[in-house]
Amino acid sequence: MKKITLIALILAFFTTFGNAAEVNVFSARHYDSDIQLYEKFTAKTGIKVNVISGKDKALQKRIVEEGADSKADIYITADAGRLGAFDAKGMFQNSMTPVIKSAVPKNFRSTNWTGIAK
């Protein structure tokens, strides 16, 4: 996937938050490239990205325990198996956008999650 496509995809995710002044990303990933994408997003939109980092199990447990009061807007993991299992629990909402639909092959997305890579 080209870098521009990934940036557009990340923007597509985040722009679903409308006029939000900030977005909370719960991330089990620890890559410098992720931080660079968040910084580019903030520079382009003015929306602050708050990153809450942790291990998959701990982040998922927190999201489940907080329920509807969860501060998580986006959950990112490097483990597709955990992603699928979390989706099966009904923990995600529909995130399909026209940008995602056109940029991401069907086998790397569902209506509730999308796989990304750099």
Regions found by a protein language model. Give the residues of each.
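Bacterial N-terminal signal peptides
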Residues: T5-T16
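Residues in and immediately flanking transmembrane alpha helices
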Residues: T15-T16, I63, F86, F92
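Early extracytoplasmic/lumenal segment of secretory-pathway proteins
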Residues: A21-A85
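Glycine-rich, phosphate-binding/catalytic loops in enzymes
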Residues: T42-A43, A88-N94
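A structural signal for short loop-to-beta-strand junctions that line the ligand-binding cleft
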Residues: S70-Y75, Q93-K118
